[in-house]
C-alpha cells in the first residue's frame, strides 16, 4: 500500500522543470502513506509521483514502473490479490516479467486487456497507467472504494492524488461547497463523489476512466454491487460463505512483510482472526478500548485470542490522548468525518504498526451480510403494508402532534413513511428541519434524499432489506467506514486489508435471501452459521460494539470546557449559528437531550475549518497551504 500524485497535461509542455517541482511538493504531503521510498516519472504529457510502503517484492517493486520498453508507465496504490493467477495466465500467453510484484502484473494485464483490465482484478486499488504510444491515461478505483482517488481540473491540467491534501498544493484557493456541507450535517461525512472543496471530486468506486490529449475525462462503470438473492438450502449457502471467506483470507495474507489483525469483541473480526490463524499460527492481534465502563471490548478480545492460542496487544485510550490527537486526525481525514470510532481506529493502527506492516480487519461484513439492527425494521413494519395510503397519511398527522418520546410515535412515523423518504443510511445526524437552525446558508431545495434517490431508483426491484444494504454500500460504507479505515491506518504507515470486501465474497453474499440475513431477531444469521465451530463460542452470537466511544459522557465532563472553547473561538460564523450549537451543548449537559452526535458533527467541521481555513491547529506534516480562500 502506498500513495501517489499525478498530472495529465492536455497540451504537451515545452519544459517540465516547474511541474517536476510541483509534483515533488504534492508527493511530500503523503509521506505517511509511503515512508520507505519515493519515485518520479515525467514527460511532456504526464507527471507521476509515488510514495512506497513496501509489501510485495520489497527489493524490486518500486514505482513508477514501466513495461515493454517504457511504453507503459504505472503508479498504483493497493494490492492485487489474484496477481499470481493473473501472472500465470499472462505467462501462458507469452508475457514475461522482470519483478515478482503485483504492480508489474497489473501493468501487463492492462497491456493485454486494455480497458477491460479493471474487471479482471481482485483486490483494493487506485491506479494511473500512461500509454506513451497512444497518449492515453487510464485509471480505475476498486469495486467498493477501499482505496481513495481524488482529482481536480486546473486550466488544461487534470491532477490526481491519493489524498486531497496533495491537491491543495496545486490549487490557488479552496472553495467550500455549501451543498456538501449541508449534506455532511446529515450524513456525518461528505457523500461521494463530492468533497468539501467544490473544485475536488473523488473517482467513484467500481469506475474507470480515460483521458486523451485535448479531451475531457471519460468515466465508465465496470462493477455494480447488485444483489441477486436465490432460494436454496441453508446448508449449501453456509458452506459457500465459509469457503469464500477462507479463500479471501488466504489471498489477503499474501505478503512479504509481517501480517497481523485487528480484533474487537464481535463476530466480524473474530471470524477473520480465527481463519487467519489457521494460515498463520503466530498471528498477532490488536485491540483498543476506553477506561469508561461499557466502552471497551479489550477483555472480550483477549478472551478470544486466548481461546485461539494467539497473542493480543491492547491499548486503553484516555480522554486526554483523544483530545490531543484529534486535530492531527482531522487533518488526515481530508474532509470532515464525524464518526467518533475513527479515533480509536487511529490508535489501534498506531499500536499495530509497532509490530506489523499489514493488518486485517472486518469492515464490510455488516453491509454484505445484514449486520445492522436497522435491517430488522422491514420485518417489524410488515403490518403497515396492509394499510391504505390515505389512512397512512392520517396516521402521520396523528404522529406529528404526539409529544417527542411518546410510545408509538416513532413506529407510526416509520411505518407510514416510504423507505426512500426515511432511510438515508446508518447515520442521520441533523434532520432537514433542524438544519435550518444550524446553517446560515440552508438551501430548502436541497435534501439528504437527493443523495440516496439514485440508489433507491437503481434498487427499485429489491426487497427493503436489500435496498437498505445497497444504499449503505454506496453511502455509509464508502463515505465513512472505508474512508476512516484507509486514512487512520495510512496515517500510521500501516496497510489495512478487508477480506469481507472481496468480489468472491460479495458474489456469495449477494445471493443470501432476506430470511437468512435476519432470523429470530439475529442479525448476520448466515455469517454466524458459517462461523460455527471456527469462532470461539463466547463471541459467536455476541452483539458487536466495534470501537465504541464515550462521547456522550465526555461532553458533559472531561471534554466540556475544551469543546466549549472550540465552538466559541471558531471562525465559522459565515456558516454556523454558533449560539444554536452552544444551546445544544447546554441541553446535553442538563440531560434534556442526547445531543452528543450533533455536537460532535459540528465540532469536527470546526476543527477542519481551523486547519484548512483559519490555519490553526496545524500538524507538523502540514507544510503547504493554498494561497487564498474563497467563501461562496
UniProtKB/Swiss-Prot annotation:
ATP binds at residues 288, 361-362. SUPFAM superfamilies: Adenine nucleotide alpha hydrolases-like, N-terminal nucleophile aminohydrolases (Ntn hydrolases). The active site is at residue 2. Pathway: Amino-acid biosynthesis; L-asparagine biosynthesis; L-asparagine from L-aspartate (L-Gln route): step 1/1. Residues 2-214 form the Glutamine amidotransferase type-2 domain. The keyword Electron transport does not apply. GO terms for molecular function: asparagine synthase (glutamine-hydrolyzing) activity; ATP binding. Keywords: Amino-acid biosynthesis, Asparagine biosynthesis, ATP-binding, Glutamine amidotransferase, Ligase, Nucleotide-binding. Its EC number is 6.3.5.4. One of its GO terms (biological process) is L-asparagine biosynthetic process. The keyword ATP-binding applies. The record marks 363 as: Important for beta-aspartyl-AMP intermediate formation. It is an enzyme of class 6 (ligase). L-glutamine binds at residues 52-56, 77-79, 102. It comes from the Bacteria. It catalyses: L-aspartate + L-glutamine + ATP + H2O = L-asparagine + L-glutamate + AMP + diphosphate + H(+). Main asparagine synthetase in vegetative cells. Belongs to the asparagine synthetase family. This is Asparagine synthetase [glutamine-hydrolyzing] 1. It comes from Bacillus subtilis (strain 168). The lineage of its organism: Bacteria, Bacillati, Bacillota, Bacilli, Bacillales. The gene is asnB.
Amino acid at each position: 500500500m502506498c500513495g501517489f500524485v499525478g498530472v495529465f497535461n492536455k497540451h504537451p509542455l515545452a519544459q517540465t522543470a516547474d511541474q517536476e517541482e510541483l509534483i515533488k511538493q504534492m508527493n511530500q504531503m503523503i509521506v505517511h502513506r509511503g515512508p520507505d521510498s519515493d519515485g518520479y516519472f515525467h514527460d511532456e504529457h504526464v507527471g507521476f509521483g509515488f510514495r512506497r510502503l513496501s509489501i510485495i517484492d520489497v527489493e524490486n517493486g518500486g514505482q513508477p514502473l514501466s513495461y515493454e520498453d517504457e511504453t507503459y508507465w504505472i503508479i498504483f496504490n493497493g494490492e492485487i490479490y489474484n496477481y499470481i493467477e493473473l501472472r500465470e495466465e499472462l505467462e501462458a500467453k507469452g508475457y514475461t516479467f522482470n519483478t515478482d510484484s503485483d504492480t508489474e502484473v497489473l501493468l501487463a494485464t492492462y497491456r493485454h486487456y486494455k480497458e477491460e483490465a479493471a474487471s479482471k482484478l481482485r483486490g483494493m486499488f487506485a491506479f494511473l497507467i500512461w500509454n506513451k504510444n497512444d497518449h492515453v491515461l487510464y485509471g480505475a478505483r476498486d469495486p467498493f472504494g477501499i482505496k481513495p482517488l481524488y482529482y481536480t481540473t486546473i486550466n488544461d491540467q487534470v491532477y490526481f492524488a491519493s489524498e486531497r491534501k496533495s491537491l491543495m498544493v496545486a490549487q490557488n484557493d479552496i472553495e467550500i461547497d455549501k451543498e456538501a456541507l449541508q449534506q455532511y450535517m446529515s450524513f456525518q461525512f461528505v457523500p461521494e463523489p463530492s468533497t468539501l472543496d467544490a473544485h475536488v471530486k473523488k473517482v467513484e468506486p467500481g469506475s474507470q476512466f480515460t483521458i486523451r490529449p485535448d479531451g475531457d475525462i471519460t468515466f465508465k462503470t465496470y462493477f455494480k454491487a447488485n444483489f441477486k438473492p436465490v432460494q436454496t438450502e441453508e446448508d449449501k449457502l453456509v458452506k459457500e460463505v465459509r469457503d469464500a471467506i477462507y479463500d479471501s483470507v488466504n489471498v489477503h495474507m499474501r505478503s512479504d512483510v509481517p501480517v497481523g489483525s485487528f480484533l474487537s469483541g464481535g463476530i466480524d473480526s473474530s471470524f477473520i482472526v480465527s481463519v487467519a490463524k489457521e494460515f498463520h499460527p503466530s498471528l498477532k492481534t490488536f485491540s483498543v478500548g476506553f477506561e469508561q465502563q461499557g466502552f471497551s471490548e479489550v477483555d472480550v478480545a483477549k478472551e478470544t485470542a486466548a481461546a485461539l492460542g494467539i497473542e493480543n496487544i491492547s491499548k486503553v485510550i484516555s480522554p486526554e490522548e483523544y483530545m490531543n490527537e484529534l486535530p492531527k486526525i482531522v487533518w488526515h481525514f481530508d474532509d470532515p468525518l464525524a464518526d467518533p470510532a475513527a479515533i480509536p481506529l487511529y490508535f489501534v493502527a498506531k499500536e499495530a504498526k509497532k509490530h506489523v506492516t499489514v493488518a486485517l480487519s472486518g469492515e464490510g461484513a455488516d453491509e454484505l451480510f445484514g449486520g445492522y439492527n436497522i435491517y430488522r425494521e422491514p420485518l417489524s413494519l410488515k403490518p403497515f403494508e396492509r394499510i391504505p395510503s390515505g389512512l397512512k397519511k392520517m396516521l402521520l398527522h396523528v404522529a406529528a402532534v404526539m409529544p417527542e418520546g411518546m410510545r408509538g410515535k416513532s413506529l407510526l412515523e416509520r411505518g407510514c413513511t416510504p423507505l426512500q423518504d426515511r432511510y438515508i443510511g446508518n447515520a442521520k445526524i441533523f434532520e432537514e428541519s433542524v438544519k435550518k437552525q444550524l446553517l446560515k446558508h440552508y438551501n430548502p431545495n436541497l435534501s439528504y434524499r437527493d443523495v440516496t434517490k439514485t440508489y433507491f431508483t437503481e434498487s427499485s426491484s429489491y426487497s427493503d432489506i436489500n435496498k437498505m444494504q445497497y444504499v449503505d454500500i454506496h453511502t455509509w460504507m464508502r463515505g465513512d467506514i472505508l474512508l476512516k479505515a484507509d486514512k487512520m491506518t495510512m496515517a500510521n504507515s500501516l496497510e489495512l486489508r478487508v477480506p469481507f470486501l472481496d468480489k468472491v465474497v460479495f458474489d456469495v453474499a449477494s445471493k443470501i435471501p432476506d430470511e437468512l440475513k435476519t432470523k429470530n431477531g439475529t442479525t448476520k444469521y448466515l455469517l454466524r452459521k458459517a462461523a460455527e465451530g471456527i469462532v470461539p463460542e463466547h463471541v459467536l452470537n455476541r452483539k458487536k460494539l466495534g470501537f465504541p466511544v464515550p462521547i456522550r459522557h465526555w461532553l458533559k465532563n472531561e471534554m466540556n470546557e475544551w469543546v466549549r472553547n472550540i465552538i466559541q473561538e471558531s471562525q465559522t460564523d459565515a456558516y454556523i449559528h454558533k449560539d444554536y450549537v452552544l444551546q445544544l451543548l447546554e441541553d446535553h449537559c442538563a440531560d434534556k437531550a442526547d445531543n452528543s452526535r450533533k455536537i460532535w458533527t459540528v465540532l469536527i467541521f470546526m476543527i477542519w475549518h481551523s486547519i484548512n481555513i483559519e490555519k490553526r491547529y496545524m500538524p507538523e506534516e502540514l507544510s503547504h497551504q493554498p494561497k487564498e480562500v474563497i467563501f461562496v
